[in-house]
């Protein structure tokens, strides 16, 4: 059984706020949107845009502040998911077994993983008040296909490190992992939790495990 260890370890008010409000949560259904002809937004500008839009929406929406899960999911789907390569994020978290998963298994994994992220961190959105996001200088070349955008979330208390891995796609820059206080969620946290479940029960066992966690979270 997955214990969502890192989710809970990172669930102090500041940490939960950072992850829920500025990413998922998450991050996270397949998230790639159809490519549209539009100017390519620089990766650091994209992160600033997403962060600002999410924080402003939460501050203006009393139902989200009260923990309305439907409104939170709608916010994530509207403001975050179009800018996330969630298939890649899920593949990273699952690791090598992703390669042998069937299309149906992959779709179910992505759906359950997204629900897990959103439900795990949704309560933190109620804590968004006066936080701001400061981008740190980005080291990247114009030809780079992957970059890391480093930010700090500032409010009451110490600044919170929140970094993003992005890849350049025909549809623009997409986020595929998030680092909260030094821990990459997909590549470190969830991968370490998923691995023993897959070893013992396979991909279907992981899907069932995630579904069970989501059912329990929905009842709370």
Q: What residue spans do the PLM features occupy?
A:
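N-terminal secretory signal peptides that target proteins for export/translocation
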Residues: 1-13
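N-terminal export leaders
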Residues: 13-19, 23
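Sec/Tat signal peptide C-region and signal peptidase I cleavage site
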Residues: 31-39
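Early exported N-terminus immediately downstream of N-terminal targeting peptides
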Residues: 40-121
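Extracytoplasmic
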Residues: 49-52, 67, 75, 81-84, ...
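Surface-exposed, charged secondary-structure patches
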Residues: 118-160, 210-220
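Short beta-strand edge/turn micro-motifs at domain boundaries
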Residues: 159-189
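Low-complexity, intrinsically disordered terminal/linker segments enriched in charged
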Residues: 179-220
